[in-house]
């Protein structure tokens, strides 16, 4: 079993999370996303026009998969989604996502205008279990 410290270190690296939600017809919807993990929640930026926005408005159940390109290390997390639409309040998390993945972040005012113009919202995924109960492989 992977230690919580190893899981935390793995999640701190710049990588994608595959977010799975449930379509209306019951099929899974999967999408790769940049993310930020703050030790309690996973944060993903999206827009109101995306399928995942509609899915998580209807049904907050989610499954998250964070892996590396080889596929030999991964963490699987059952979670519950919350849509956060107050962009100004969530600006630190939008900033953290960009910084984690090596992108420059404009000043707050310019960043807020861009996020608003794009119709951005923040998806906050709260794990349904503590990290010690997540399925993880290759992190031993």
Outline where the language-model segments fall.
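Amphipathic alpha-helical interface surfaces
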Residues: 7, 52, 90-93
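Short beta-strand segments
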Residues: 14-48, 54, 62-66, 75-78
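Short amphipathic alpha-helical segments
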Residues: 51, 56-59, 138-139
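Alpha-helix boundary recognition
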Residues: 11-12, 57-58, 116
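Charged, gly/pro-rich active-site loop segments
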Residues: 73-140
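Extreme N-terminal tail/first-helix region
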Residues: 1-16, 107
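Mobile beta-alpha loop/short-helix "lid" or hinge segments that flank ligand
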Residues: 69-71
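Generic structural signal for secondary-structure transition and capping sites
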Residues: 15-16, 61, 102, 130
């Amino acid at each position: 079993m992977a230690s919580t410290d190893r899981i935390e270190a793995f999640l701190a690296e710049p990588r994608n999370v595959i977010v799975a939600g449930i379509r209306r017809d019951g099929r899974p919807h999967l999408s790769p996303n940049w993310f930020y993990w703050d030790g309690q929640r996973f944060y993903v930026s999206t827009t109101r026009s995306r399928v995942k926005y509609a899915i998580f408005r209807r049904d907050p159940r989610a499954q998250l998969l964070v892996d590396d390109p080889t596929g030999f290390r991964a963490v699987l997390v059952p979670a519950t989604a919350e849509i956060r639409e107050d962009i100004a309040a969530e600006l630190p998390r939008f900033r953290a996502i960009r910084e984690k993945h090596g992108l420059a972040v404009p000043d707050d005012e310019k960043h807020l205008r861009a996020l608003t113009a794009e119709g951005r919202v923040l998806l906050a995924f709260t794990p349904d279990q503590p990290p010690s109960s997540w399925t993880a492989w290759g992190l031993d």
